């Protein structure tokens, strides 16, 4: 166990690829958008590789089938409107929490630790998705990619979350599946926890100091298992 875990006062989570598997609905929205624009569909695995930087960036990547290129502005605008319209209406058709998500959240909540969601997804969509999945009540704070002037990998959302929760950011844990989560956590000065069941490749990310998480877990209850002895000691 990382020594820093002894000082944890709040836990923040990424959403897509950490709390839930949302790719099926994200991919369905991409397929609907491409069909409306008269373009060929992309495999769900390709769409999965494009997730993590917000829907605006996802639309660019899907339209160009390239992680780094941007689509023509007029095409992007049409695509974005189409994507958002479909996705808003189909947020949780196939999206489900990962098997041990709710158990892990309930265990952490039992310790009296405030929980937050820090995602690059639009805040309204994130809040509605959590509500539809029955997870919203676990969280004291939900921050989306459009909640603040900067999003992950900027440390700003993490620092803001800590401020709202009334704790030092060094006493917060950021749990996620992507480089954005880990880079943001390191820049903010808090503990980074990588999950092995999401969309990011933790083995690959761990090879680089900049994206190596402080701790890797295979299920959310593992966080509780490490925090619970500490909380018992404090009592």
Curated annotation (Swiss-Prot):
Checking HAMAP family in the record gives:
GPH_hydrolase_bact
EC number(s) per UniProt? 3.1.3.18
Q: Which reaction does it catalyse?
A: 2-phosphoglycolate + H2O = glycolate + phosphate
Keywords of the record:
Carbohydrate metabolism, Hydrolase, Magnesium, Metal-binding
Q: Iron: present as a keyword of the record?
A: no
Q: Which GO terms describe its molecular function?
A: metal ion binding; phosphoglycolate phosphatase activity
Biological processes, Gene Ontology terms:
carbohydrate metabolic process; DNA repair; glycolate biosynthetic process
Residues binding Mg(2+) are 14, 16, 177
Is Lyase among this UniProt entry's keywords?
no
Q: What family name appears in the similarity comment?
A: Belongs to the HAD-like hydrolase superfamily. CbbY/CbbZ/Gph/YieH family.
Q: Which residues form the active site?
A: 14
Q: Which cofactor does it need?
A: Mg(2+)
* Name assigned to this protein: Phosphoglycolate phosphatase
Q: Pfam families recorded for this chain?
A: Hydrolase
Q: Which terms in the GO cellular component ontology are assigned?
A: cytosol
Q: In which pathway does it act?
A: Organic acid metabolism; glycolate biosynthesis; glycolate from 2-phosphoglycolate: step 1/1
Q: Which organism is it from?
A: Neisseria meningitidis serogroup A / serotype 4A (strain DSM 15465 / Z2491)
Primary role: Specifically catalyzes the dephosphorylation of 2-phosphoglycolate. Is involved in the dissimilation of the intracellular 2-phosphoglycolate formed during the DNA repair of 3'-phosphoglycolate ends, a major class of DNA lesions induced by oxidative stress.
Name of the gene encoding the protein in the UniProt record: gph
Q: List, alphabetically, the CDD domains matched.
A: HAD_PGPase
Tell me the superkingdom of the source.
Answer: Bacteria
């Amino acid at each position: 166990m990382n020594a820093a875990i002894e000082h944890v006062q709040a836990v923040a989570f990424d959403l897509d690829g950490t709390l839930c598997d949302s790719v099926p609905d994200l991919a369905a929205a991409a397929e609907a958008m491409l069909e409306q624009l008269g373009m060929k569909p992309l495999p769900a695995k390709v769409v999965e590789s494009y997730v993590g930087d917000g829907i605006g960036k996802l639309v660019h990547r899907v339209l160009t089938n390239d992680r780094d290129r941007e689509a023509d502005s007029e095409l992007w605008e049409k695509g974005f409107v189409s994507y958002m319209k479909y996705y808003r209406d189909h947020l949780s058709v196939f999206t489900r929490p990962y098997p041990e998500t709710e158990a892990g959240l309930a265990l952490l909540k039992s310790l009296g630790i405030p929980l937050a969601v820090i995602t690059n997804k639009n805040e309204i969509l994130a809040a509605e998705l959590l509500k539809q999945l029955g997870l919203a009540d676990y969280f004291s704070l939900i921050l989306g990619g459009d909640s603040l002037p900067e999003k992950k990998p900027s440390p700003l959302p993490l620092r803001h979350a800590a401020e709202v929760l009334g704790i030092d950011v060094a006493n917060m844990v950021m749990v996620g599946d992507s480089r954005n989560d880990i880079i943001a956590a390191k820049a903010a000065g808090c503990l980074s926890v990588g999950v092995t069941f999401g969309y990011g490749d933790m083995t690959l990310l761990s090879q680089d100091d900049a994206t190596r998480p402080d701790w890797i877990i295979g299920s959310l209850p593992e966080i509780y298992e490490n925090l619970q002895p500490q909380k018992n000691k404090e009592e």
